Curated annotation (Swiss-Prot):
Gene (UniProt): ispH
Species, as recorded: Yersinia pseudotuberculosis serotype O:3 (strain YPIII)
Subunit and interaction comment: Homodimer.
Annotated keywords: 4Fe-4S, Iron, Iron-sulfur, Isoprene biosynthesis, Metal-binding, Oxidoreductase
Protein name: 4-hydroxy-3-methylbut-2-enyl diphosphate reductase
Pathway: Isoprenoid biosynthesis; dimethylallyl diphosphate biosynthesis; dimethylallyl diphosphate from (2E)-4-hydroxy-3-methylbutenyl diphosphate: step 1/1; Isoprenoid biosynthesis; isopentenyl diphosphate biosynthesis via DXP pathway; isopentenyl diphosphate from 1-deoxy-D-xylulose 5-phosphate: step 6/6
Keyword 4Fe-4S assigned: yes
Record: residues binding [4Fe-4S] cluster: 12, 97, 198
Binding site for isopentenyl diphosphate: 41, 74, 125, 226-228, 270
Amino acid sequence: MQILLANPRGFCAGVDRAISIVERAIEMYGAPIYVRHEVVHNRYVVESLCERGAIFIEEISEVPDGSILIFSAHGVSQAVRAEARSRNLTMLFDATCPLVTKVHMEVARASRKGKEAILIGHAGHPEVEGTMGQYSNPNGGMYLVESPDDVWQLNVKDENNLCFMTQTTLSVDDTSAVIDALNTRFPKIVGPRKDDICYATTNRQEAVRNLANDADIVLVVGSKNSSNSNRLAELVQRMGKPAYLIDSAADIQEFWLQGAQCIGVTAGASAPDILVQQVIARLKDLGAGESIELSGREENIVFEVPKELRVEVKQID
């Protein structure tokens, strides 16, 4: 069996920044450090940070007075931000991905101008909850759609004063279909100046598409609650190839590999490379040969941590 590795795969700049913020806060201020929601959607990362002194909570009320709080990479609503600022906290750091913040600013701008806004996204995802929570104009409207069917059923106040934006981790193909429906249903709707789906999501979907062309099966390293990891597995499955979303090498089932000559491996944007290396080692134990990395788009984007946290610390592998 041959192992093919997608390129690019794994950590994106927003995830790197978010994890670094938690690591550096622990290093500078000591444990415990409170984080609202999982800083990124990866079990290994969350467990590793817990071992170092991070405490993950869902409600601001769970944070004791005088503590240090960090918002996750997915962002928070205006209401959550205001609640945190009203508390007697020592420090408050925001690990929201800058590309998510860009979408937040689009929604806030629409709210100020009185435009109705439509968000393409998955209900219940923390990024969607945070983005929807940027809209506060009582005379306007903020709506969530997930599919073309949602668009056809949507009723708005003023079809001539509409804009749309998207969750950053969606399927490029699925989103395109929803945007087509929006443009047909509401001809005067205005979209973002630049695509809201982030570079890392787009690049990893392109890379896994190339990978699936050559692989018999594809293993996607990522947690079940990771939106971008799920989209990678779905893309492969739509191409007619089996794809399995796994948290770690221990999840691999030998029968998946029966008859496969070429096994593709990729990782979602919140999955660290150490998990990919463990998957490769497991596949070799099961008889696979050396791994070969495909060519792909080079990524050089770096997002800086807050200036208060710019110290050298040991990072998660």
